[in-house]
Amino acid sequence: LLSRRQRQMCIRDSTADAFVLRGAKIVYVDIRPDTMNIDETKIEDAITEKTKAIVPVHYAGVACEMDTIMDIAKRHNLKVVEDAAQGVSAYYKGKALGTIGDFGCYSFHETKNYTMGEGGALLFQDENYLEKAEILREKGTNRSKFFRGQIDKYTWIDYGSSYLPSDMNAAYLLAELEEHEKIDRKRMAIYNYCLLYTSDA
């Protein structure tokens, strides 16, 4: 997303690495103690003329106040990149987390709600980002076009990495997603149990 220095982001530190690697300057915004999410009332004070995006983290699958965040982004002409790493199958006012902003990111790391050991998914609203996403996924090459027969050879275009999961890992993830309602019920039962026995502490 960012490749020039001195651009700024409003973001949590656990999400910062991807932006720092592209030369962005990170601006931290404090959290709300009730949700552990970004405090939407403090975002505008952190915005400068160099700010390019707001990156809300839906901590533990609890939704940030996306209406307010999207309104701020619109007024300041900023992109919104949702870190929905823990937000698969979680919603904000009927909308799936990761599908509200310009971009959404899911994680399938072993510590997340649904896992294939590693990896994730990138969602975006504007289909013009599709080619860039494919290049990032294919080690910085236009290999996807080659496999579709759109070009006769592929080459390096930009930076990227090897983000393609193995068939086996994808099969693990698919099996979990097919059981998402059962998994969600179990997680909610554990949450309610913990809440019940810690509320008096």
Question: Could you say what each language-model-derived stretch is?
Answer:
Residues L1-L2, L78, L177:
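Generic leucine side-chain signal with a strong bias for well-ordered alpha-helical environments
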Residues Q6, K50, T99-I100, M116:
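Short loop/turn motifs at secondary-structure junctions
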